[in-house]
Design a protein with these regions (language model features):
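Catalytic cores of nucleic-acid endonucleases
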Residues: 6-11, 30, 37, 57, ...
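Acidic-basic catalytic patches of nuclease active cores, encompassing PD-(D/E)XK
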Residues: 1-39
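Amphipathic coiled-coil/heptad-repeat helices and related helical stalk/stem segments
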Residues: 20, 43-46, 85
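Short, catalytically relevant binding-site loops at active-site mouths
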Residues: 42-44, 67-68
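Short acidic loop-to-beta-strand element that houses the catalytic metal-binding Asp/Glu
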Residues: 44-53, 58
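Acidic active-site catalytic centers that drive phospho-/nucleotidyl reactions
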Residues: 20, 49, 62
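Non-catalytic C-terminal interaction segments of nucleic acid-processing enzymes
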Residues: 105-158
Length: 158
């Protein structure tokens, strides 16, 4: 049982790191600069994973990378922000003099989607409603079911 837990923890950590790489590329593609992975300086920075700027506005981003489908095969439609996300985001905004945002990266076996928005537009929700992102009711769609070209078996929750 312990080996299964270690393997699952490694899978989730790797999926998170993959998500951060996809997030950085998405930010570059959209003209953001001064992109910095905050986890490089101090592991598990509260709330934010990335910091960047565009048009003089500094933002911090919590990246949530998840499997598109849950183990039972249903759509994983809500990505939890974590405990006390708004309190941590507020502290991080003050620390970095930036505005808090989120990025949800949804990985399927052969495709990925990226959704992006400000924390304030979640209106206190404790999770990112990816189903509402897909319907264009919240956030922005940066990529939708775009093909990726890597073996996803390791990252799959099946």
């Amino acid at each position: 049982m312990e080996d299964i837990n270690k393997k699952e923890a490694a899978r989730k950590k790797s999926l998170g790191e993959l998500g951060e790489l996809f997030a950085i590329k998405a930010l570059v593609d959209r003209g953001y600069d001064r992109i910095r992975n905050l986890n490089d300086k101090s592991l598990n920075e509260p709330f934010a994973d990335l910091e960047c700027e565009k048009d003089g506005t500094k933002i911090i981003i919590s990246v949530k990378a998840r499997n598109k489908f849950e183990k039972k095969g249903t759509l994983n439609s809500r990505y939890n922000l974590g405990n006390n996300a708004y309190g941590k985001a507020y502290a991080s905004e003050k620390k970095h003099n930036a505005v808090a945002h989120w990025m949800a990266i949804q990985f399927g076996k052969t495709t990925f989607s990226i959704y992006f928005g400000s924390l304030s537009e979640l209106l206190g929700k404790k999770a990112i409603p990816v189903d509402l992102c897909e319907k264009k009711l919240i956030g922005e769609i940066w990529e939708h079911d775009k093909r990726h070209y890597f073996d996803f078996d390791f990252y799959s929750n099946k």
